[in-house]
């Protein structure tokens, strides 16, 4: 279904202590598209284009279909980006160790985005064993295939499909969105949500432990995904998702002398050490580690020594290919795996 909508005006929203680009690129949401100086995307059913100019967000409203209940646009945007969170107080509650301080300074202005519950749950079910770029591809594919089209100026965006729409799809249809085995989990969960057996809105009243238990009972949801949904959709700011980046960061930075640290030990440590805003601390640690690794890899690839090494390797490869192509392929495959270094963190990429 397509809705063609044009801009009506630009609305300015105060946004102190907020970094729009960093928040959208921190692994919380995956559908926003960089367009010009800003980003085009959807907040629920609403299509918007957002630019940041200092402490002000300039928002152009692409609108929503008439059937959608309409709240004032500034309220919609401010709530979505959690502009009401007392960020200075939250950061002041973090532990004062060097690792956390470095991440806090690096992530200044990053806020936990308040996401629609079904959209967040479904997206993170799709995220299992996937890197951020792949999650984005899946999210956009689901939106294009099953969502509603909007236009924000000249930019086409799509809403996230409702649970009822996914529930009517076939597993094969979902697999066409590169979901793989996750297609069945998403389909089964969508059917539970659309039937009312899993009432995501009603679960808002549950205490943390009960909410986590309810989420973990859904197909495709384990402790990590449950904590992501609790943090990003239910605003449980103590929730501390532990993925491969966080696990390695915790082990290397907080348990450097222990040869073996179990997942249970990491969970217990994170719950007590990072406190009532542990979810924010986790997001800062995650984004810092992931971003620093990318910058480190880019710097290494662009360095004169690395470029020279690549040129030398190319000459050596041409010589080797004349001797033995099979031998060359084997050596190339062996040389492709090297650990990355990311400033204060020493973190290897996903294996």
Task: Give residue ranges: language-model regions.
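Short, intrinsically disordered C-terminal tails of secreted or membrane-associated proteins
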Residues: 344-350
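HhH-family (HhH-GPD) DNA N-glycosylase catalytic core used in base-excision repair
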Residues: 1-303, 307-318, 322-337, 349
């Amino acid at each position: 279904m397509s809705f063609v909508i044009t801009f009506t005006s630009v609305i300015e929203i105060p946004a102190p202590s907020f970094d729009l680009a960093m928040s959208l690129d921190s692994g919380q949401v995956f559908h926003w598209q960089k367009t010009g100086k800003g980003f085009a995307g959807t907040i629920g059913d609403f299509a918007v284009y957002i630019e940041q100019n200092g402490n002000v967000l300039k928002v152009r409203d692409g609108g929503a279909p008439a059937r959608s209940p309409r709240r004032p646009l500034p309220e919609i945007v401010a709530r979505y980006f959690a502009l009401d969170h007392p960020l200075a107080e939250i950061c002041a509650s973090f532990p004062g160790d060097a690792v956390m301080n470095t991440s806090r300074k690096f992530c200044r202005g990053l806020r936990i985005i308040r996401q629609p519950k079904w959209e967040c749950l479904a997206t993170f079910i799709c995220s299992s064993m996937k890197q951020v770029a792949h999650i984005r591809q899946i999210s956009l594919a689901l939106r294009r295939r099953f969502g509603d089209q909007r236009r924000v100026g000249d930019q086409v965006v799509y809403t996230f499909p409702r649970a009822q729409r996914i529930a009517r799809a076939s597993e094969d249809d979902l697999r066409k969105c590169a979901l793989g085995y996750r297609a069945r989990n998403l389909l089964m969960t969508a059917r539970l949500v659309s039937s009312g057996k899993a009432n995501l809105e009603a679960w808002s009243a549950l205490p943390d432990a009960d909410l986590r238990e309810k989420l973990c009972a859904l197909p495709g949801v384990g402790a990590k995904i449950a904590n992501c949904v609790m943090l990003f959709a239910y605003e449980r700011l103590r929730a501390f998702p532990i993925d491969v980046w966080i696990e390695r960061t915790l082990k290397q930075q907080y348990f450097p002398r222990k040869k073996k640290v179990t997942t249970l030990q990491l969970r217990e440590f994170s719950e007590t050490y990072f406190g009532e805003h542990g979810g924010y601390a986790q997001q800062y640690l995650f984004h810092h580690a992931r971003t620093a690794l990318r910058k480190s890899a880019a710097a290494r690839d662009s360095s004169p020594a690395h470029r020279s090494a690549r040129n030398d390797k190319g000459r050596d490869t041409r010589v080797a290919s004349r001797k033995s192509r099979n031998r060359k392929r084997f050596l190339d495959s062996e040389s492709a795996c090297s650990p990355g270094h990311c400033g204060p963190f020493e973190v290897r990429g996903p294996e």
